[in-house]
Amino acid sequence: MENTIGQQFVEMTKYKNLEKSLQSQGVAWPDLRLPLPEGAEVIDLPAGKALKLDKLDFISLVEQRETIRSYTDESLTLQELAYLLWGTQGVKSILDDKPVTKRTVPSAGSRHAFETYLLINNVEELQPGLYRYLALDHKLVRLPAPQDICGILTEACQNQRHVRNSAVTFFWTAVQVRMTWRYCQRGYRYMYLDAGHVCQNLYLLAEAIGCGVCAIAAYDDDLVNAALDVDGVEQFAIYIATLGKRQK
């Protein structure tokens, strides 16, 4: 039988093939923060839990959830965006004695390797462009980007029109050392699993506010990484999802 790349990945990330972890070697905990661009604009967000929702039936949310690629021209409010960010990466607490966060989504060993980048197209109070969520502070930072960053990222996502037509597109990146520090190469498995947890939360959160989501795995890794200004090795794009208001 052919030894495929996928088969090699599964084999080489088995426990029997792992080296000693950085944690076991006494290497310091990875940083939970990325540096901010010099002079970058930091934007306060409303509290994520402050959004007033109609009384919801959770079973109905789960049952009604579906992938939606067509959105209306209605803007997302800043309060709604804050709610979506809090529900997908929100920090509930930080341990006193170590840099470990408890969040609104599960993560292997509470490692939480992800950063959330946002392509903003149609959100009230925000200029269109590229942003990053500062989860520990519950703020946004606007990132330097070409004027046509929407077109660049749409092309990087194989010209899927719902990227351009979304109110916002979520780009999750993995800072791999946050996970591999403890779990070595097996940590790559966990990062992909964790991405599913985050995106499923987005689907359900969106359903509760009349929005639709389409998760995207079909993208050019190198083009997306370049557009987000990440190196593709230490930090790389791992999952994408478009979001906008549903048709009535």
Region spans (language model):
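N-terminal accessory segments that position/regulate proteins before the catalytic core
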Residues: 1-169, 176-177, 195, 209, ...
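Short pre-catalytic strand/loop immediately N-terminal to key active-site residues, enriched for Gly-Thr
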Residues: 186-194
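C-terminal folded domains that constitute the principal catalytic or ligand-binding module
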Residues: 198-203, 207-208, 212
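Short acidic/His/Gly/Ser-rich catalytic and metal-binding motifs that mark active-site loops
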Residues: 178-182
